[in-house]
Design a protein with these regions (language model features):
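Short consensus segments that form the blades of beta-propeller domains
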Residues: 73-82, 110-111, 140-145
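Surface-exposed loop and turn segments in beta-propeller and other repeat-based domains
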Residues: 99-112, 171-180
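Acidic, divalent-cation-chelating loop motifs in proteins
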Residues: 120-126
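Acidic, small-residue rich beta-repeat scaffolds with periodic aromatic anchors
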Residues: 20-48, 56-57, 147-150, 154-210
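Acidic/hydrophobic-patterned starts of short beta strands in beta-sheet-rich repeat architectures
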Residues: 62-67, 127-137
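Bacterial Sec-dependent N-terminal signal peptides
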Residues: 1-26
């Protein structure tokens, strides 16, 4: 599922997920359901959610994915309003939340991390009945170094807890530098279908920011 604020796109993607029996809803602060989730479950992370995703997974339960931003007061050299990122996936349990995995990255020096919401997705690429969560973000910077574009993949793969894998594309700033990609050892062990999906997200996100 690709998360966009365009209602027709969101509706279509949700109906596709329903057909696959993994039912996913995507909510922003202007949505009534967003407010209902906050009232019922609260906000378990620092900052404010820019997006909340709920996925009901048959035989596993209901998962809630928060993607939060927090404006920082400490000084950085970054032009604009620096923000820290806090994200987490939680399992609903009798009106409460059980943490499954969390993420955070902080603004510092000349840069700050920035969610690429249009490229954060939930999907079941390997069709094993449990979705993968694809968190995509960019290391925006006023510096001259190459800037990281990252896709973090959260999978379960028969385990009790979610695990993290990552692929990074380094976006060159200077003409003499070249674009390159690197992935961690965990990413290399993912099923081919999941790797290909993450690589496509990275490719599409790269086009989207250039």
């Amino acid at each position: 599922m690709i998360f966009r604020k365009l209602l027709p796109v969101v509706t279509f993607m949700i109906s596709m997920s329903s057909f696959a029996q993994i039912r996913t809803g995507v909510y922003f602060s202007s949505d009534k359901k967003y407010k209902e989730i906050i009232e019922e479950l609260g906000n378990p992370l620092e900052g404010n959610p820019v997006m909340i995703v709920k996925s009901f997974v048959p035989n596993h339960g209901s998962y809630v994915w928060y993607l939060n931003e927090k404006k920082i007061e400490k000084g950085t050299y970054f032009e604009g309003i620096p923000k820290d990122l806090y994200s987490g996936i939680f399992l609903e349990d009798h009106g409460g939340l059980i943490p499954q995995i969390t993420f955070k990255d902080f603004a510092k020096d000349l840069g700050q991390p920035m969610y690429l919401i249009n490229y954060c997705e939930v999907g079941d690429a390997d069709k094993d009945g449990f979705p993968e969560f694809y968190l995509t973000y960019f290391g925006e910077s006023d510096g001259l170094d190459a800037k990281p574009l990252k896709v973090i993949v959260y999978t379960k793969r028969g385990q009790k807890t979610l695990s993290k894998s990552k692929i990074t594309g380094w976006i060159p700033y200077q003409e003499e530098d070249k674009y390159r990609e690197e992935s961690d050892a965990s990413f290399k062990l993912l099923p081919k279908a999941i790797r290909l999906k993450a690589e496509k997200i990275l490719k599409d996100a790269k086009k989207g920011i250039q």
